[in-house]
Every structure is written in structure tokens, then in C-alpha cells.
Amino acid sequence: MYKLIALDIDGTLLNSEKKITNEVFNSIQEAKKSGAKVVLSTGRPLPGVTPLLDELNLNDDGDYVICFNGAVVQEVKSKKILSNIEMCHDDFVLINNLAKENNTHVHINTPTNLIIPEETPNKYTIHEATLNNIDIVSMNEEDINDDITFCKIMIIDEPEKLEEVLENIPKDLFDKYTIVRSAPFFLEFLNKNANKGTALEALCNTINMPL
């Protein structure tokens, strides 16, 4: 019997119509009844995956979720963060300068919102906030500091502008960060140590489940 089942969302949990089939739903309910932990693993924040967790009844005490492609592990019901492989203010400064040099925009993903270092959000930041049911917070650059939980940092803009950014990224940044073009208008930067494998290991250690 499986003790823990980790599921990606797109292409695994959801079909081509972005829906959960009855077969998948029933399989997850059976697994949960058998005592297995069913854990969704996603690039989204917890608010962005909460509707799916509710639909699948994966919102009880003892249910967990892996967010931001492994950067964050959370308890679903309490929202308590169990593991966080975050970035820092120095990372923001570096990536924000890269965005400025290429005349593009940047936002910071925290567990609960999007932070922008400008007054008016880019349309793609609005798209991300709407998609994930989170607020946009505008801050002055000088007020952004290490009190913020930097889950990931994104450069966002028109696809052709992001192509230029990719061409201009110094090679050493590809060694320093995990850089993902998650959509034509999204370029994500994550801590190099953040991935779904390390997140699962952290979760298993937290709940005393042998790997």
C-alpha cells in the first residue's frame, strides 16, 4: 500500500480540459480512505490551488501541499509553512536590475500575495493575481527587504521582450538560480535548491514518514 502519493496538477491531475475526471476523483478518495497521504505538487501558491484541494477533499488536518515548484511545503488547513527554500533581498536586487536593464517588469511571489516595486501593476501581474486569487501589493523599492518571504521572483512582460531578457541573462545566473519560462509572458527565478524532490523529502521528514 502506498503511504504517500504526490500528484502534479497539469497533465496528471487535470485532463486536457483542465478538469478532474470521475475516475481520478474516485481514485484519490479511495487512496485517502486507505490511509495514504495525497499531496498536490504545483507551481502555484496555496490560494491558487485551494479550489482543487476543496474539490478533492484534501483540506483536512494532516493534508499537505507543495507550492512554488517545491520552494514551499504547507499544511492545507492551518496554512502553516513546514518547509521554505526561499530567496532573499539580494536576489531581488539582482533580478530587478536585470528587468530594468531590459525595460521589463518584475514581481515577487510570497505565500499570500504578489509584491511589485512600482505603483501600477503590469497586466500580466494582474493575470497572475487573478488566476491564483491573491492580492497585489505595491511597495517602494527601498521598503522591500528580507522581512519578506521571497518564494520566487518573476520577470513578466510581452513574449518578445522576454526573449530579449533570456538572451541577455549572464551565464552565471543559470548556475545561481533555477530559471523557468513557465508561460510566454512569465520568466521565473527560484532558489536552485528548491524542487519537488527536496520538498517531498522535507515533508516526509516532518511527518516522520520513511522515504
Q: Which ranges hold each PLM region?
A:
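Core-facing hydrophobic residues within beta-strands of well-ordered domains
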Residues: Y2, D60-G62, F150
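Asp-based phosphoryl-transfer active-site loop
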Residues: K3-K18
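Conserved strand-loop elements at the edges of beta-sheets that form or border functional pockets
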Residues: L7, C67, E75, R181-S182
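Conserved short-loop catalytic and cofactor-binding motifs
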Residues: T12, K37, K80-S83, F150-I153, ...
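Short, solvent-exposed loop/turn segments at secondary-structure boundaries
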Residues: E17-I20, I85-E86, N191
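Short phosphate-engaging motifs
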Residues: I20, P45-G48, K161-L162, K196
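Active-site phosphate-binding/coordination module
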Residues: N22-K123
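Conserved acidic, metal-coordinating active-site core of Asp-based
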Residues: L98, N102-L211
